[in-house]
C-alpha cells in the first residue's frame, strides 16, 4: 500500500486506493452537479475514470508531499515530468492492443483543462475530507492543511465545488447517526 500524508501524524492511515476511489466518487458528483444544477454537459463518468487514475503514477514515484511538490514552479514542472515518465512506464505494462484506452487516464498532461479542473477540485475535496476526519478524531495536526485546502478550493472558483461544499460537506462533519439528517436538509 502507498500511504498518503506521510509527513503528518494520522489517526487513520489513508492509502492510494482509498483516496483514488473517494476522488472518483467526488469527481463524478461534481460532473453530475455541473450537468443537473448548472446545465453543463461534462461527462461525469469520464471524470470518475480520470480521478480513479489521477495518482496512479504514485505506484512508481510514491506520494510526494504537497508542500514539497508545489514549493516552486521549477519543482512542480520537474515533478510533472517525473509523473509523465511514470505514466508512460505504467503504459508499457499494459498489452499494446489496450494501451490507447489507458493513455489519457494515465497521462494527466493529455487531459483537457475542464476535466483537469474537476478532477483537481475532487482531489482537493478528498484531502479536505481527510482533514475533517482527522479533526473529528481530535488530531489538530491537520488544522493548517485544512485551512490551506479550503483557501485553495475558494481560489479555484468552481461553482460545482462550492455546491458540493454547501450540500455534502456538512454530512461529513456529523456523527454517523446524524449524517442522514445533514444530507436530507441540504436539498
Question: Where does each model-flagged region fall?
Answer:
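Alpha-helical, largely C-terminal catalytic domains
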Residues: 1-187
Amino acid at each position: 500500500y502507498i500511504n498518503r500524508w506521510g509527513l503528518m501524524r494520522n489517526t487513520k492511515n489513508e492509502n492510494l486506493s482509498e483516496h483514488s476511489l473517494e476522488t472518483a466518487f467526488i469527481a463524478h458528483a461534481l460532473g453530475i452537479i455541473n450537468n443537473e444544477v448548472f446545465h453543463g454537459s461534462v461527462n461525469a463518468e469520464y471524470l470518475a475514470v480520470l480521478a480513479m487514475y489521477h495518482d496512479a503514477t504514485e505506484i512508481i514515484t510514491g506520494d510526494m508531499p504537497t508542500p514539497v511538490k508545489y514549493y516552486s514552479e521549477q519543482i512542480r514542472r520537474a515533478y510533472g515530468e517525473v509523473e509523465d515518465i511514470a505514466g508512460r512506464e505504467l503504459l508499457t505494462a499494459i498489452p499494446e492492443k489496450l494501451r490507447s484506452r489507458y493513455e489519457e487516464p494515465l497521462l494527466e498532461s493529455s487531459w483537457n483543462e475542464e476535466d483537469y479542473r474537476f478532477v483537481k477540485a475532487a482531489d482537493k475535496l478528498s484531502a479536505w475530507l481527510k482533514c475533517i476526519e482527522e479533526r473529528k478524531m481530535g488530531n489538530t495536526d491537520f488544522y493548517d492543511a485544512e485551512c490551506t485546502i479550503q483557501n485553495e478550493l475558494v481560489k479555484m472558483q468552481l461553482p460545482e465545488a462550492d455546491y458540493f461544499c454547501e450540500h455534502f460537506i456538512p454530512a461529513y462533519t456529523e456523527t454517523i447517526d446524524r449524517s442522514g439528517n445533514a444530507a436530507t436538509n441540504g436539498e
